[in-house]
């Protein structure tokens, strides 16, 4: 087929259908008057519970309308972790999650369709509250972080200021019938269910809130859900009526007296402290200097510096196997220039560019780290290759132009903004911007400067997808890797692009089982 300028084609193949089909699964104690699947769909934003949906009707098991979700648009639960131990943590920053510190066992989290696994490098436990905000090894690309409330506890407890509370979790599964009897469904951590909580929260000490839900669960909500064992760390979202937004209010800590849900609050002061500890001092480029920032790094000590004239900025990267030793760097100043003199292994440290920058190297130095954030209206010309087995994670609304030389053996995972692949050929004519490209979250666009930048079969669309702008280039796909209907092919060029889908099975791809020469029936 072909695609002309401005055309966007949704990409979905049978290879991806399995990711869309529901499986038998559920979370916590829920009311038995409603279909069990309703609670699952609610927690997974499936069916009528798409994020942003309004005035959602709720029907009981008899198909009778029992009410509407009309206090707020449907919350987006995508910031809640999935796959292993789903619901135990929520993304609150591109590199940090929130949960309870008594959750000691989990070491990694996944989001969206669970394609990527993010490893915890620092647990960041609160000194007194049942709360921790672990740091991850990479910037998350599949989803956007939840907004953590900055409201006072008094405001959170005021129903006129917080008109709705929704929860999700994967604790031990029970259904309570209309007579109050609980029926066991399955153990915890299998899948998410969720529901609506009343607005009658009250104080739990100085760092938490609690909610009474004793008696029959049906008395508390038209879609009731009560946390159980295994729900620890699961999120409580509240609708801020003044700001018109959902906010993460707290994380589930436990149950008091068998009737009270207890949530730990997330102090903004604690978050600021944690984030600050992981940042090096901002780096400022002085355009009047006439020289680039010279970036040196000593992998044996995990330390380095960026120097321009008499100005020098210290930086910290991975030290031995300690990824958390890597600190984040933010670059300020217009039309900045950075020259890598050594390969930099920044560990869990990320790079944030607030303005236009060019990053280059004259000796083939490479960079690895948590990823790159390019702020809105900024453009970064990235002329540095990665390494095999590592992926460059890119987020931020700005543009990253990849313009290195030769074959880059590293991969790309992009979750926001624009990435232009314009890798240049080396002296032997070899060119590859990335070994693989993953487009996720529904926010990003990847633009191809030509059809040599990446093997089309190594391009994939993750959770909620994004746009692959073929930019007038002809491409042949032997397979399409799309997690859902968010995958899009676009063409911003005036030139028509021909897209060939060649699914013909090659003889080498066919596996043949042969009988052994003994003729005794053994394969």
Predicted regions and their residues:
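Extracellular, surface-exposed repeat architectures
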Residues: 325-404, 446-523
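C-terminal subregion of chymotrypsin/trypsin-like serine protease catalytic domains
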Residues: 28-62, 87-103, 192-221, 225-294
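Chymotrypsin/trypsin-fold serine protease catalytic domain
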Residues: 135-226
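Catalytic histidine site
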Residues: 60-116
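Acidic Gly/Asp/Thr-rich repetitive segments characteristic of extracellular carbohydrate-active
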Residues: 292-330, 415-418, 427-439
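Glycine-centered positions in the ABC transporter ATPase nucleotide-binding domain
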Residues: 95, 398, 417-419, 442-444, ...
């Amino acid at each position: 087929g072909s695609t002309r300028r401005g055309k966007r084609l949704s990409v979905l193949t049978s290879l991806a259908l399995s990711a869309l089909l529901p499986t038998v699964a559920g979370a916590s104690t829920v009311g038995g008057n409603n279909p069990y699947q309703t609670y699952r769909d609610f927690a997974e934003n499936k069916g009528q519970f798409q994020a942003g949906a309004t005035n959602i009707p709720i029907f009981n098991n008899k198909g009778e309308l029992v009410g509407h979700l009309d206090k707020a648009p449907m919350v987006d639960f995508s910031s809640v972790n999935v796959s292993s131990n789903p619901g135990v943590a929520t993304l609150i920053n591109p590199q940090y999650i929130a949960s309870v510190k008594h959750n000691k066992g989990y070491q990694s989290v996944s989001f969206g369709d669970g394609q990527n696994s993010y490893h915890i490098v620092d647990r960041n436990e609160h000194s007194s509250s049942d709360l921790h905000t672990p740091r991850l090894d990479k910037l998350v690309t599949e989803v956007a972080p939840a907004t953590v409330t900055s409201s006072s506890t008094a405001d959170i407890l005021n129903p006129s200021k917080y008109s709705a509370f929704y929860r999700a979790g994967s604790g031990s599964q029970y259904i309570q019938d209309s007579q109050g009897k609980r029926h066991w469904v399955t153990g915890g951590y299998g899948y998410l269910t969720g529901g609506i909580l009343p607005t009658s929260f009250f104080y739990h000490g100085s760092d938490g809130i609690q909610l009474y839900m004793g008696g029959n669960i049906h008395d508390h909500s038209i879609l009731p859900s009560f946390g159980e064992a295994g729900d620890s760390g699961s999120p409580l979202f509240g609708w801020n009526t003044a700001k018109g937004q959902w906010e993460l209010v707290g994380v589930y800590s436990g149950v008091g007296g068998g009737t009270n849900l207890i949530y730990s609050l997330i102090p903004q002061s604690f978050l600021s402290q944690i984030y600050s500890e992981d940042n090096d001092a901002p780096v400022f480029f002085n355009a009047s200097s006439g020289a680039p920032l010279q970036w040196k790094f000593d992998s044996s000590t995990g330390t380095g510096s960026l120097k321009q004239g008499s100005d020098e900025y210290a930086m910290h990267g991975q030290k031995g196997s300690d990824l958390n030793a890597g600190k984040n760097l933010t670059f300020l100043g217009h039309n900045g220039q950075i020259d890598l003199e050594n390969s930099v292994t920044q560990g869990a440290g990320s790079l944030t560019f607030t303005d236009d920058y060019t990053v280059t190297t004259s000796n083939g130095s490479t960079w690895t780290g948590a990823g790159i954030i390019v702020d809105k209206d900024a453009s970064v010309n990235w002329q540095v290759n990665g390494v095999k087995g590592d992926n460059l994670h890119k987020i931020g609304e700005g543009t990253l132009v990849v313009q290195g030389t030769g074959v880059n053996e590293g991969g790309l995972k992009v979750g926001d903004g624009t990435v232009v692949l314009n890798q240049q050929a080396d002296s032997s004519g070899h060119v590859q911007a990335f070994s693989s490209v993953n487009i996720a979250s529904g926010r990003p666009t990847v633009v191809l400067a030509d059809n040599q930048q990446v093997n089309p079969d190594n391009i994939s669309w993750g959770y909620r997808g994004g746009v692959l702008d073929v930019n007038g280039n002809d491409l042949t796909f032997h397979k399409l890797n799309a997690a859902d209907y968010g995958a899009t092919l676009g063409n911003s060029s005036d030139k028509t692009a021909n897209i060939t889908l060649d699914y013909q099975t090659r003889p080498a791809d066919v596996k043949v089982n042969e009988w052994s020469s003994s003729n005794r029936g053994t394969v």
